[in-house]
From Swiss-Prot:
One of its GO terms (molecular function) is transferase activity. This is Phenylalanine--tRNA ligase alpha subunit. It catalyses: tRNA(Phe) + L-phenylalanine + ATP = L-phenylalanyl-tRNA(Phe) + AMP + diphosphate + H(+). Its EC number is 6.1.1.20. Its main location: cytoplasm. Its cofactor is Mg(2+). The keyword Metal-binding applies. It is an enzyme of class 6 (ligase). CDD domains: PheRS_alpha_core. Binds 2 magnesium ions per tetramer. One of its GO terms (biological process) is phenylalanyl-tRNA aminoacylation. Belongs to the class-II aminoacyl-tRNA synthetase family. Phe-tRNA synthetase alpha subunit type 1 subfamily.
Length: 348
């Protein structure tokens, strides 16, 4: 009998055995005896050394087809036998379906997720789009497109996790803005966007610093955008976040990607400006940085700064949550202690 004929006979006999087997143990025995290292298929393959070079690929391919066919048949029969065993077990059990089931604990959205969604909803209501981007970024988009060339001294302001000379874990969500600006079709209208997400810096973790935290950056680019537009937008946001009687003030500052740049303070929502430990008895809380988009940043995105202008801002939802809920240690947000997190549980 030729090797191919042996394989055909093995196939037919094994398929009959598989169809007739009644237990998983017997099925496994067939699998071991037929497909194992000492099984007949292996023996056939070993006998191929006596075949001519022309016959070997034909018989070898046929043997592999038989092995695949039998493997599929065994798996199909296994499913049938498992279902039969399950049905038999269920028939033997006495189950009172009226008994109450086990109450599964229900989770809820993390407090930082709640705060971020609240901020996103505010800006969605003002016509902004939410755009997310890569956490692993290129040096080009993270720094150079933000007016921070390789020799710029302001790079010392941020310690960065580098993956290679040109790739890093983003230090802010600004790269999302750069990528969006270069793709936006201004013939269809202004660009209004926020870019939420995780950012990473080489900070030593303590009560107020974390190597990983969240950031939401906003950007508007259009014709005739002014600092007044920026101030009005942030006033609306602060009133919705902290109360209608909130006021903001702008203080001159410096950021490489905006000119002019400002630090934005909000009147204390705890004491109403009278002075307390939250505002350090000043009546004001530093809340975010902002400014008018630097002309160089616009130009690098293919936008004519003589025709278009824009404003940008960035705030930390982690800090907003700490201020709003009186959390003194940022690490509490990330330690997964349910005793802490359940304080902020909301009904879904």
């Amino acid at each position: 009998m030729t090797l191919q004929a042996q394989l055909e006979a093995l196939r037919d006999n094994t398929l009959k055995e598989i169809a007739q087997v009644a237990t998983l143990k017997e099925l496994n025995q067939i699998r071991v005896e037929t497909l194992g290292k000492k099984g007949p298929i292996t023996e056939v393959l070993r006998g191929m050394k006596n075949l001519s070079p022309e016959e070997r690929p034909v018989v070898g391919g046929f043997a592999n087809e038989i092995r695949d066919l039998l493997t599929e048949a065994i798996e199909a029969r296994k499913v049938v036998l498992e279902n039969e065993a399950l049905n038999a077990a269920l028939k033997e059990e006495s189950l009172d379906v009226t008994l109450p089931g086990k109450q599964m604990p229900q989770g809820t959205r993390h407090i930082l997720t709640q705060v971020m969604e609240e901020i996103e909803d505010i800006f969605l209501g003002m016509g902004y789009q939410v755009v997310e981007g890569y956490e692993v970024e290129s040096d080009h988009y993270n720094f150079e497109r933000m007016n921070l060339p390789k020799d710029h001294p302001a790079r010392d302001m941020q310690d960065t996790f580098y993956i290679s000379d040109e790739m890093l874990i983003r230090t802010h969500t600004s790269p999302v803005q750069a990528r969006t600006m270069e793709k936006h079709d201004f013939s269809k209208g202004a660009l209004r966007m926020i870019s939420p997400g995780k950012v990473f810096r080489r900070d030593t973790d303590d009560a107020t610093h974390s190597h990983q935290f969240h950031q939401i950056e906003g950007l508007v680019v259009d014709k005739n955008v002014t600092m007044g537009d920026l101030k009005g937008t942030l006033e609306v946001m602060m009133k919705k976040m902290f109360g209608e009687d909130r006021k903001i003030r702008l203080r001159p500052s410096y950021f490489p990607f905006t000119e002019p740049s400002v630090e934005v303070d909000v009147s204390c929502f705890k004491c109403g400006g009278a002075g307390c430990n939250v505002c350090k008895h000043t009546g004001w809380i530093e809340i975010l940085g902002a400014g008018m988009v630097h002309p160089d940043v616009l130009q690098m995105s293919g936008i004519d700064p003589t025709e278009y202008s824009g404003f940008a801002f960035g705030l930390g939802p982690d800090r907003v949550a700490m201020l709003r809920y009186g959390v003194n240690d940022i690490r509490n947000f990330y330690q997964n202690d349910l005793r802490f997190l359940n304080q902020f549980k909301v009904k879904e």
